[in-house]
A protein has these predicted regions:
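Activity-critical C-terminal alpha-helical subdomain
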Residues: 237, 241, 338-353
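Loop-rich catalytic cores of soluble enzymes, especially ATP-dependent carboxylate-amine ligases
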Residues: 57, 65-66, 333, 339-340, ...
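FAD-binding subdomain of flavoenzyme oxidoreductases
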Residues: 1-141, 146
Length: 353
């Protein structure tokens, strides 16, 4: 259910799914875009569908649990299974189809997906805007969310430093002061006239903030691509300088946008506390979704122990302080599987079994 730079929670796979073809563990193939396949499945798997319908009914009858599920999906969330399917759909075939999203193959093998399309506007403008500190940059994101923006990507000072020596990077990256945080902002429109209006709206939002340099948007395709290479180069940059024998770890968390600044600052404090000095933070600020990347040696027992304590503290902080998502868009995976119940609570967690 990864939605990347622009799709957020409104245009992700869950909300744009038109049909899905899936192979279940018993060998049955269900194609929700084929009426004959659906009819046959309703007959052959009536007990499975009845079970899903019953599970959905039990969730809806529990007001507190249903409210918890709704609240969890107001931000990006792929921790565990897509429990929102149990309250969003009445037809158990639709419930089954949407449970597949983010399930990482544990419920079935997805062989085909048909999506509803969304507009892809030809007119685009991008700007890389530098703020003096993380808190100010994140505060700006709160305001930008109400403006006509399609993407707002956050890059902390460490991530900007990581790509500074790559070919084609803006020279300014090499001279930025400690703490400087960038927002890569993009707006799109159906016409050049409308694009100008949207750029003006974004600049109006940025006007009160003291910036490292004046915010300037470009509409030139090559220049836009150059700016986006700053963002796209962050993850490979960490891998390129890792020590032999270490593994690059990338995590994927989300909090409500007003909490983003405090969350990022807390993450940076934990990096320092546990000695992950090369760690970087970047991500989809418009949705409160950030990735943090660092390297880890799993061949040394003491290093594994350090990592375990670090992850315990990260997960505890994200859940207990921010009620965040431990996996925002990339599925649960091995790293976060032990923490699913911590995030969801026992009642919701039991639904997944």
């Amino acid at each position: 259910n990864s939605s990347g730079m622009c799709c957020g929670t409104a245009q992700n796979s869950y909300n744009t799914l038109a049909s899905i073809r899936v192979l279940l563990a018993d060998g049955c193939v269900l194609d929700t875009g084929d009426a004959a396949s659906v009819t046959a499945f309703r007959s052959s798997h009536a007990s499975l569908l009845d079970g899903l319908a019953g599970l959905a009914a039990s969730v809806r009858s529990d007001a507190a649990l249903a409210a918890r599920i709704r609240a969890k999906y107001k931000i990006k969330n792929t921790t565990g299974y897509s429990l929102n399917a149990l309250i969003d759909f009445d037809d158990p075939v639709d419930i089954l189809a949407h449970l597949m999203i983010g399930s990482e193959g544990t419920l079935g093998f997805i062989s085909q997906v048909t999506y509803k399309t969304v507009p892809e506007y030809a007119h685009k403008a991008s700007a890389l805007v530098f703020f003096h500190d993380m808190e100010t940059a994140c505060r700006a994101v709160v305001g930008l969310k109400s403006r006509p923006v399609d993407a707002v990507e956050l890059l902390d000072r460490a991530s900007l430093h990581a790509v500074a020596d790559m070919a084609g990077m803006p020279p300014l990256l090499k001279t930025l002061a400690d703490g400087v945080t960038a927002l890569l902002i993009e707006t799109r429109a159906p016409s050049a006239f409308e694009l100008d209006a949207r750029v003006a709206s974004v600049l109006e939002e940025l006007q009160p903030y003291p910036l490292v340099e004046t915010a300037t948007f470009t509409t030139q395709a090559l220049e836009i691509e150059r700016l986006w290479q700053v963002r796209k180069g962050t993850f490979p940059a960490v891998g390129a300088v890792r020590k032999p024998g270490t593994t690059v770890i990338i995590e994927d968390v989300a909090v409500a946008v007003p909490m983003l600044a405090a969350c990022c600052l807390d993450l940076q404090k934990l990096f320092a506390k546990h000695g992950y000095h090369e760690a970087i933070i970047f991500g989809h600020a418009l949705e409160g979704n950030v990735h943090f990347v660092f390297t880890q040696d799993f061949g040394i027992e003491a290093e594994v122990a350090r990592y375990a304590v670090f992850m315990d503290e990260v997960c505890g902080m994200l859940v207990e302080k921010y009620d965040g998502s431990l996996k925002a868009e990339h599925g649960t995976g091995r790293n976060m599987a032990p923490f699913v119940e911590l995030e969801w609570g026992s009642d919701a967690y039991q639904l997944m079994w």
